[in-house]
Structure formats: C-alpha cells, structure tokens
Curated annotation (Swiss-Prot):
Belongs to the protein kinase superfamily. Ser/Thr protein kinase family. Gene3D superfamilies: Transferase(Phosphotransferase) domain 1. One of its GO terms (cellular component) is cytoplasm. Residues 61-91, 98-119 have a biased composition (Polar residues). The active site is at 329 (proton acceptor). PROSITE patterns: PROTEIN_KINASE_DOM, PROTEIN_KINASE_ST. This is Serine/threonine-protein kinase PTK1/STK1. It comes from Saccharomyces cerevisiae (strain ATCC 204508 / S288c) (Baker's yeast).
Length: 662
C-alpha cells in the first residue's frame, strides 16, 4: 500500500499530460493489487512526454539480447494494436524484480520511442496507397513481398475479380466485321442512348450482361443493351469475330414475330457500371419463359395456353431452320415474352449456319461435333462429348444440329406441362433419363411397335407413364415423346412436327405470317462525317415524329463552319455520289470472319431506321382473341393470356429481363 501511495503522489506531480494519462489508465490502477504490477501499469505511452531522443539514448542502458528480440518483434505489430504493443514493449524493458539497476520514467519511455522509430514502418516514407495493395509484408504476413504482384486496372473495375479481361484500347469499329448491307452510321452507344436511371442488371451470363437503355430523344422508348464480355483466354480478334457472327445471325433473323429484334452493334464506353467493349441494342422483353414456369401459379395455367406457347416457340425455330440457321441452345431461359404475350427466341450466341455453303440453302448439311447447348435440353448424342462422363470415343459421332433443336423443343414441351424439367442430363449417368428410356422402350414393346415410324399418329403414352401423365391427351404426349426421342435417327424433324395433325390444331394467339410491328430506335447522331454534305437537323426533320407544332418548321441552328461549307441548308451533293449498291440476299462468307487492315470506308448513306415492313393482308386469328390497345390491329392476344399476364405482373419491380448467353 505504501508503494501505491508514493507512486500516486509522484504521478500527481507530473505535468498535465501525465495527469491525462493517469485518467486513461485509471481503471487498471484501481483494479491492480500487486505492487510490481502497479508499477508496470503506471508506465505511460511515448505520446504523453516530450523527452528528446538524444537524451534518452545517452541515459538508456544496454538490454539483453532476449529483450531486444522481443522488442524488435513488437515493433512489427499491426497499427490497430499499437497501444497494446507499446504497453507490452514498455513492460518487457523493465528490469527484473530485485535488480539494482534503476531506470527513470522519462528515460524508459524515450527508449521505447527510440526503438519504435528505428523500426521498418517509421523509417519508410508515406506512399499514397488507397487500395492497400502496395503495403509491404510484416511479420504477420505469410507471403513475402517479392511473391506479390500488383493487379492491373481490371482488378478495380471488376470489384477485385482479375479473371475478367478487358479489350485493349482502342475498341475496333464494328463496321470492320460487318458486311456492307449491315454497316451502321452510328457505332457509339452514347450517340443516341443513355443508361436507365435504375442502373440495374436485368440479365447476365458467362459472356454478357444486360441493362436497360433509353433513347436520348424519347425517354419512354426503352431498349435492352446486351454488353458482351471476353470469355476464358479469348483473344480480342476472336472476341470480335464471335460477337459479329452473333449479331449477323440475330440481324438476319429479325423482322419475324417470334424472334427478338436486334437493332444495332455499338461500342460501349467504360462507365461506373460497365467496361468498354461491344454491345447489342435489342428489343426489351417483359419476362423469360423460365421465370414464368417456376412461379407457383403456373400449375393452374390451362393446357391450351401452354400448348399455344409451345407452338409459338416452334414457329420461331422453324423460321430459323428455313433461313439455314440452327439455334443450338433452346431452353425456356432463351424465350422472351413481349408485353402483349408473344413468345420470341433470343440469344444466338452459339447459333450457326448448318449448310456447308451458307449462301446455298440446297448445299449439304454441315454436322456438328462437341459439347453444345445446355445439358437438360441437349440430346444424348451431344452428351457423349462431355469430357466429365468419359464416354468411349466410338460413341462420339457427328450429329445434325437441327435434331438438337427438335430435342430441345420436346424437353420444353414436357417442362411446360409437368412444371419441372424431366431430368437433369440426357445421359446414362442420370437416373431420370434412364427411367425415361426404359419407359420409352416399354411403350413401344407393349403398346405401339410402330411408334417411331413416320406418319404414325396413333395416341402416345397415357396416365401409366410418369412423364405423360399431365398431358391428359395421348396425341399431345405423342408429339412430346417423338420430339424427345433418344434415337436421333427416328426423332421428329421440324417438318414432321408441322405435319402432325395435333400440332396443326393448336390454337395460337398470333399468326406467324403477320408482320410484327416493333418500335425502332431513333438515330439522329452519326459517328462518321458524311461526305455528301449531310445536315442532321434538316434531313431528320421529315422522319422524326413529333407532336409539337413549334418544332415542325423550326430553322435549325448552324455553325459558322457549316455555313461556310454549305451556304444553303438544303444544299447536297447527291448527284455526285454513286447510288448505293442493292442489298445482297445472303451475307458474304468472306465478310463474316475477315479482319480488315484498312479503316472502314465512309458511309454513303445514313440509315435512320430500318425500312418499315409492308402492310400484310388481314388474316383472322386461329383462336378467339382480343385486340391490344395501342398496337397494330393484327397483333392479338390469346383469350388465356390474362392468366399468364397475372403471373408476369405479380413479380417484383425488376421484371424486365433479357437472358444472357451461358
């Protein structure tokens, strides 16, 4: 108790900084009962005294090697535990109990400050390091500094995921990879579009992400931007070829009622939400088919509506095959529903021309080899190429890509009716698929030995079979099972499907022969300088719709350079420019995958929007229908669609989605 009294008296005689230190360590002093511990607890940190370093060096004694080692270890402690490390360091430098060596309080703390100032942290200069990636290693780190490498810029642009690669600057002009009839006057996204205020990702996949964009000139016009990313160890040239091929196929298949329209291939700049690259400006869908099937209310949807959706998807597939293109990745995620209930195919990332000569539709069929598509909807002949299954190479035979699409149609029909996918993989390792194959053979052996023969329209499996129980119609189950035939040689083709009497009798909500009127984006700003003296405000006035009478006859504001070059606002040199070449029927094969070394030629014409489709002849729908307000009179809605729309609008606010390629 005497030691405690004397010590407290000495502390009270210290300057104000020592008194504040006493308050800081007050709880420790009151809780201590041992004299030696009390003496150690009263040591102050170096921040509360002002003794010079030179004086402390002259008065501080030499310490044993063991104490030096412990002091050096404490100097490398983390900065967040600085108080604890200082306390332990000052405790370790005290002489043992009963020692005759006396160390003054000032010298003791100045020695601690000197030792810490000689540490590695104190001797180095401060470096601006906001991300903390250049911090040198300490005794707490198990990896040496020489083994660490600073990440590149992509590390920060992708939230630390350095595996995602970015295209080098400058981004290549998309017109260098497009045929002449598909070249664009505007290749910059920022020329005519802005990102939606929500800035949400509405779709994503392994090679892309989808966001909403709006027109600069009409905010209510909303479109989808499919931002494409590099995959695996893809080189920039392979990336450009892959994306341009997908755009050419999607553009070729546009203008059909059951195909999602693709408008532009543009360059996307680096923003807060996206990285630089290429992107598609596409029609925005309301919801994909998979999101509707997984809702609990889908079970109550009538079979007539499900069959209507199936027929719309089949019409889209048939149109692709008629154009010489195989989709090769059919699944509910790649089927979009428009606001008026029309089903549309999307995502042509792995689609391809299935003729040896894409220009000649009568040329032989080009077969495929390798693992393509999604396992639940890929046929058995494709699953033989799965490296994880280790199938015998003799089973890996080239296959017709059209048969792959037909098999996917059969699985989609089963999924629509049964509300779940029938099995996970179409291979012998999946128990569900093995049961399906056994049931298939049992039905042929016990009920209909001619089930696989062409032209046989007898009823298919009934209630006794698990995957045919919910069809409640033998003819409907026949179509589903014939499309999903495990044997590719006897599987239904797209022509066999459209010749089936049951399929022909399905009532649909839209006629596939009708022209779908889709709102196209307004293009006012061009990327290139037009060589024919194009004046944007003058030429666009006749094609830009407006309801404001004050804007119709408004004289545009012109710069002095424009006035000097063209004194008359309507002066053009159309006579000197050659007429544009007629559009080609097919895409030149050499233009699809050839990189031009010269810059793109100046565009002679400006495409403000695609040519409006010809007005089709009125055709009566094949089922009771209702007109859609504000749309073409030929666009009708099925009488069962109100159930589907109730499922769509019951979702969350982020209901618009365009599936991305996987």
């Amino acid at each position: 108790m005497t030691v405690s009294h004397n010590h407290s008296t000495k502390i009270s005689q210290q300057p104000i900084s020592s008194v504040s230190a006493f308050k800081f360590f007050g709880k420790k002093l009151l809780s201590s009962s041992h004299g030696n511990k009390l003496k150690k607890k009263a040591s102050l940190p170096p921040d509360f005294h002002s003794t010079s370093t030179n004086d402390s060096e002259s008065s501080s004694p030499k310490l044993p090697n063991s104490l030096k080692t412990s002091r050096r270890a404490n100097s490398f402690a983390h900065t967040t535990n600085s108080k604890r490390s200082l306390s332990s360091a000052s405790t370790k430098i005290l002489p043992p109990a009963g020692s005759s060596t006396s160390i003054s309080r000032g010298n003791r703390h100045s020695s601690t400050s000197r030792n810490l100032s000689n540490s590695k942290f104190s001797s180095e200069r401060l470096v601006y390091n906001p991300y903390g990636v250049s911090t040198p290693s300490t005794s707490l780190s198990s990896v040496s500094t020489s083994m660490k490498k600073d990440p590149d810029l992509g590390f920060y642009l992708h939230d630390g995921d350095s595996k995602i690669r970015m295209l080098p600057i400058p981004i290549v002009d998309p017109n260098e990879y497009l045929p002449d009839e598909m070249k664009e006057a505007s290749i910059q996204l920022s020329d005519n579009f802005v990102f939606d205020d929500e800035n949400k990702t509405i779709g994503w996949g392994g090679s892309c992400e989808v966001r909403k964009i709006r027109s600069k000139y009409r905010k209510k016009d909303v479109f989808a931007l499919k931002k494409l990313n590099m995959i695996y160890n893809e080189t920039p040239e392979k990336f450009y070829k892959r994306c341009s091929k997908e755009f050419i196929i999607a553009k070729q298949l546009s203008h059909h009622v059951h195909i999602t329209n693709t408008f532009l291939l543009v360059k996307v700049p680096t923003t807060v939400y996206t990285t630089r690259g290429w992107g598609f400006v596409m029609e925005l869908g309301l919801r994909d088919l998979f999101a509707m099937i997984q809702k609990s209310g889908w079970r109550s949807v009538a079979l007539a509506e499900k069959f209507c959706i199936f027929k719309q998807v089949a019409c889209g597939v048939k149109f692709c095959h008629d154009q010489g293109i195989a989709h090769r990745d059919l699944k509910p995620e790649n089927v979009l529903l428009s606001p008026d209930g029309v089903c549309k195919l999307t995502d042509f990332g792995i689609s391809d021309w299935y003729h040896t000569d894409p220009h000649d539709l009568s040329s032989p069929v080009k077969k495929c080899a390798g693992m393509i598509g999604s396992p639940p909807y890929a046929p058995p002949e494709v699953m033989f190429y799965d490296s994880k299954k280790h199938y015998d190479t003799e089973l890996q035979q080239p296959y017709d890509p059209r048969a792959l699409d037909c098999y996917g149609l059969g699985i989609i029909l089963m999924t629509l009716v049964n509300n779940v996918i029938p099995f996970l993989e179409s291979c012998s390792f999946d128990t569900g698929f093995r049961d399906y194959c056994d049931a298939y053979e049992n039905f042929i052996r016990l009920h209909d030995r001619a089930f696989r023969n062409r032209g046989n329209y007898r009823p298919g499996p009934g209630m006794e079979y698990h995957l045919a129980r919910n069809f409640k119609n033998g003819h409907a189950s026949r179509v589903a099972w014939r499309l999903a035939d495990p044997e590719a040689a006897t599987r239904y083709t797209i022509d066999d499907l459209f010749e089936d009497p049951w399929f022909q009798g399905i009532e649909t909500c839209v006629d596939a022969n009708d022209k779908y009127v889709c709102k196209k984006p307004i293009i006012k700003t061009t990327t290139y300088e037009n060589p024919r003296g194009f004046h944007i405000a003058t030429d666009v006035a006749a094609t830009t719709p407006t309801s404001n009478p004050f804007l119709k006859n408004r004289v545009p504001i012109r710069s002095m350079v424009d006035i000097a070059a063209h004194p008359s606002p309507t002066a053009t040199v159309l006579a000197s420019s050659p007429p544009p070449p007629p559009p080609a029927t097919h895409v030149p094969a050499e233009a699809l995958f050839t990189l031009r070394e010269t810059p793109p030629p100046q565009l002679a014409t400006l495409t403000l929007s695609e040519e409006p489709p010809a007005t089709p002849a009125p055709s009566a729908p094949s089922a009771p229908s209702a007109r859609v307000r504000g749309h073409s009179p030929h666009r009708v809605v099925h009488h069962h669609l109100n159930i589907v729309n109730s499922l769509v609008h019951s979702s969350s606010a982020a209901s618009s989605q365009v599936p991305a390629s996987t």
